[in-house]
Amino acid sequence: MTLRYLTTVALCILPVVIQADGLAIDKVYHPYVQAMEKEVEWRMVAADGDHLQRLGIGTALTDRLFVEGYLLAAERGDTFRLEGYELETRLQLSEQGEYAVDWGMLVELEKAHKEGAYELATALLMEKQWGRWVGTANLWLEYEWGDEVKDEVETAAALQARYRLSPKFEPAIEFYGGENTRALGPVAMGDIRFAAGKKLHWETGVLVGLSKKTPDATLRLLAEFEF
């Protein structure tokens, strides 16, 4: 694996990713793993009266490999119910600063609750720093199959530009692209540190729809306790 090869692949597939079917607006992943880290994560995406929530717990198995399991629940109108389960694996492919761009990979397997519907997704994670600015890109490839699900391959992209103002507050702008998703908007995030390496990471943002198929406004929230 070389930097030139990965960069060429990323530049070739980016236009295809943005033009193809899209994943739901969620979050932007970073390509790093901290050895011995454990976390409990909650996040929510809300649009047009619907709320999708995830509750997960994860741990680093090595200094390059992190795994996390999630419960997925949705509130649609007056109904709140369990929607599915997800297993996520994140792999750090290069050391931070080893190349001009830092590289990682993410693999997710999701199963619908009480249904035989499955979803397998993988993403190439890229991050680059320019002084206080940090640029991050996630390029997704997803395959769905199972009961009452049309077998199909979908792609999407999530992009983030973040300014490292202070550890407690970092403003950013995010873009999510796919055939059914075009959204852009401001995001804020930060870390609240406690003793003995524990911290609370938070994110909040509003993504504005840029196409008729995308909700006018999507709210995303995230809280992640790392220990």
Model-identified regions with their sequence ranges:
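Transmembrane beta-barrel domains of Gram-negative outer membranes and organellar outer membranes
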Residues: 20-227
